[in-house]
Amino acid sequence: MEKFNFVVDVMNNGPMEKMESFVHEEFLFFKEYGMQDRDEWLSEIRELVESDWQFTEPNLLAENEDVLVFNHIVVDDGQKFRVTAVNFLKDGQTWRLSTHRTLIKD
């Protein structure tokens, strides 16, 4: 739970410099049909960290020296989604990240 707790704490409380230290130099983010490099992703995450955004219902699914998998809930345009994030780790840092959103039907 060490890395999971770290990510939740930094995303909810900052500072952004902590997140930067967790992101590998070779980092790539895959989202639906797009891809971001380290600088692009950190820029987007910086906006979240510096706003009042918070993880909602973060849930750890798996964590070991190779992978960190968790999900959380987001509301977008009045619809509720479960976002699952799969982080492949290299040298103790997030190296590849992929997310998937699943609509939650009440």
What are these regions (language model features)?
Residues 6-9, 21:
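Surface-exposed charged/polar residues within alpha-helices that form helix-capping/stabilizing sites
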Residues 5, 12, 30-32, 36, ...:
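A beta-strand edge to alpha-helix "cap/lid" segment located at domain peripheries
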Residues 13-28:
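Short, well-ordered alpha-helical segments enriched in acidic and aromatic residues
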